């Protein structure tokens, strides 16, 4: 997968897979062993599919188009549910996201009469990568729905403001 000017390789951690496969045949266990690595950081790569065959279902799951379905960026966050998200992009930013969509599911659903904004829906897991992308657009894009994501963005922006005012770290990580 190509993301932010870097190629990534999707694979399975074999040594752990051998141990888990002996103890359990559940494909969900194997899914937890999937690793995504930046290609430019790999110093040695060995194809071992012949020694450690995966099921046809698992091979299909690991293709980039299936593995990254409904995902933004390189992380597939199983614990983050797929959501239908509605955003509003203001002029001239909407020209940019129409030329380079935020996600392949992006669809324009409304345009203001005065041409000042357009609204879009996306079906995606709202991962950290996705939130960072929305924040990168600053005040030019806002989340309308779901309300939980809108409130999360408001919380992030409030924490950012307070961090700038106080010089303290308020990222929620200890």
Question: Residue ranges of each PLM-predicted region?
Answer:
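Residue-identity detector for glutamine
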Residues: 5, 106-107, 132, 151
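Coil-to-beta-strand transition motifs
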Residues: 2-8
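Generic C-terminus detector
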Residues: 122-174
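Surface-exposed, charged, gly/pro-rich loop-and-adjacent secondary-structure segments at domain edges
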Residues: 10-129
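Structural motif
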Residues: 6, 41-43, 140
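Well-ordered beta-strand positions
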Residues: 1-2, 110, 135
